[in-house]
Amino acid sequence: MTMRIDIATLFPEMCERVLSESIIGRARQRGYIELACHQIRDYTTNRQKQVDDYPYGGGPGMVMQAQPIYDCCVDVIRQMEEAGHARPHVVFMTAAGTPLTEEKCKQLAQKDSLLLVCGHYEGIDERVIEALADE
């Protein structure tokens, strides 16, 4: 069975280039995994395509806004379900999260589908993590 991996990021072109090479590239070519990268900026509602803002409730630095991430994830989940895939296991990749170890990769590899949400800036608005994250 082919594993489906979707990546929500601000840098989909960079992800595509890296994930088309080496072991992952060969796995894609052989049909072991199906991979798609999604641009979070495409889901903003402002003309400037801005995705960062001050943290809700205050705090230092800038965080990724909840709305474009939420809309992107909901759209990806809908697309996957319409294509006959199960709801993906949603993982938010942030500096404050659990380290990505070999053991964690083995656990994630057992899932039928994944939606990896890549953080940037000081982090991700906690409200979207609470709403969507499985991890």
Language model regions located:
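N-terminal nucleotide/polyanion-binding subdomain common to many enzyme families
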Residues: 1-83
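S-adenosyl-L-methionine/SAH cofactor-binding core of RNA-modifying enzymes
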Residues: 65-120, 126
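Receiver (REC) domain switch/active-site residues of two-component response regulators
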Residues: 134
